[in-house]
Amino acid sequence: MRPPFVDCHSHVVPSGDDGAKDLADGIALCELAARSGTEILYATPHVWPHLVLTDRREQTVRRAFEALRVDTPLELRLGYELTPAPPLLDEDPARYALEGTDVVLVEVPFIGPADGLFALAEHIESAGFVPLVAHPERTEALRARPSLADELAERGWPLQLNTTSLTGRHGPEAEALAWRLIEDGHGRVVASDGHRLTRPARLDGAYELVSARVGEEAAAPLFDGTGLGLRARRPTPSRAGARDA
């Protein structure tokens, strides 16, 4: 039996990044996610070196998030996806955590080594949070050095795989790596990383593939949030108010 899904990585809130371009786009993405079985959806706007989370941007994201939450048929929660950058090492990871959890989503840069990832993940961990490593299977670093996945797992940093890698959308290398990470137990959660209607926030297709390959019992924790405790913990009503920038 297919479980209700928890999707911990999406870009459904218009935030100035490469995700939803406006509220109508975000609503359409959320409605499709709900129809395909998602019960809880984390909106995780990008925090890039060239698109940081200023107080003003945080206010803008929060307003868009609250407006979107009113008009969507699923439970929408807020978090952020961090790209490693030195200034983040001076910030409190709590600001970026997936709402209601101690998890902070961090991506491995697609191109180049993963050096910055380790510094940021260690900073997150030292503050009492868990770094969740986003889509490592899509990165040049893991393709060049497959043992990187073992190093991350040995540190206790869970790996999040993209549905689109498992379905082959990102090419045979990403597909093969994603399946290997599931089969060796390093992949702890599958998420959509949905950006737009041509790359939607839905988990159902990947769930069918994974459950057919490893069985429903093994597949369920990858998709229902229980593997990271994302379903059990409820978010606080709202985050602390942002300051004007």
Functional labels for PLM-detected ranges:
Residues 6-8, 42-44, 77-81, 132-134, ...:
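Active-site neighborhood of phospho(di)ester-bond hydrolases with catalytic His/Asp-centered motifs
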Residues 23-30, 87-90, 115-118, 176-177:
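Short, acidic/polar
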Residues 31-34, 125, 182-183:
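Non-catalytic positions within long, well-ordered alpha-helices that form the structural scaffold/packing
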Residues 48-51, 83-85, 138-142, 166-169, ...:
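Active-site environment of divalent metal-dependent phosphoester hydrolases
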Residues 52-160, 239-245:
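Extended substrate/RNA-proximal surfaces in nucleic-acid metabolism proteins
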Residues 186-202:
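Short acidic/histidine-rich active-site segments
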Residues 204, 208-245:
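Mid-to-C-terminal alpha-helical segments outside catalytic/metal-binding sites
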